[in-house]
Amino acid sequence: MKSEWKSFLIWLLFLAVACSALQTILAERSHVSFLKEDTCETWEFRQQHLPAELSDQIKELERTDRNFSEILTVTMLEGKFFPRIIFTDSSLYRKYKPEEYELLKKAYQAVWEDVNCFPVPAEDIFYEDTFGEERLYGGERIHEGTDLFGKVKKAGYYPVLSMTEGTIEKMGWLPLGGYRVGIRSPHGGYFYYAHLSEYEKNIKEGKKVHAGDILGFMGNTGYGEMGTSGKFPVHLHLGIYILSPDEKELSVNPYWILNSVKKKTRNYRY
């Protein structure tokens, strides 16, 4: 009888341990269940909501051999894409969602990894978070970028700099964007600079550029046939685009990226 009772207690203990382990697994799986292959297509991801103080903290951790994109990705996931604190442990995502996690990390790399300077070398530049607001010219659409304005309203006054290194993939006239430059960065992000008044000399498609190189000058071209200008105030429209896993082009919000490099404003005489 004692032997049977002992076996029964052992069986109960085993069952309790197994149930506890199962509950842990279920809780862990539930915690990461919202991460999908197409998470980078969600509106929450496209907002890129990372306050500058958190960006600075991640960069500080990067100096201790921690990977910026790794910390950024898990911080965004744990903060449900609107984080207030930094997270560093990605183990659950790597355990249960390794492929989905790597896809999302790659998307964040395309947006953030190559950015190294503010696009206008002046202290008097101002901008607001208008990503997603309604635009009507050329048909109903949303604003897919951030507009940067300077105190000087003259076209051609402010230089426009490349925020990243990369290759000039597109340039020339667009009915909406006017004279524009599109640069593909090393990690795959497409950085779009629009409404330029003119281009810097020797700028051409296929040319390699470095962060801080002058691309052209802030203007107000666009909203019409080639050469149209003056239909809106002088400003730079900055767009950032990535490719989704199924090769769909997606715009993301540049506002928070701009905030993260505002301290890296270059000084030029012009």
Place the predicted regions along the sequence by residue.
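Cationic-aromatic interfacial patches
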Residues: 1-91
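Surface-exposed, glycine-biased beta-strand/turn segments
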Residues: 34, 41-44, 70-179, 211, ...
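Generic detector of contiguous secondary-structure segments
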Residues: 111-112, 123-129, 191-208
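Small beta-barrel nucleic-acid-binding modules, principally OB-folds
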Residues: 141-153, 182-189, 241-252
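Residue-level detector of conserved, well-ordered beta-strand and adjacent loop positions
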Residues: 149, 184, 194-197, 210, ...
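Zn2+-dependent peptidoglycan hydrolase active-site motif and core
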Residues: 161-202, 227-229, 233-234
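A structural signal for short beta-strand/turn segments enriched in small hydrophobics and glycine
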Residues: 166-168, 206-221
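Acidic, glycine-rich catalytic/binding loops that coordinate metals and/or anionic ligands
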Residues: 210, 217, 231-270
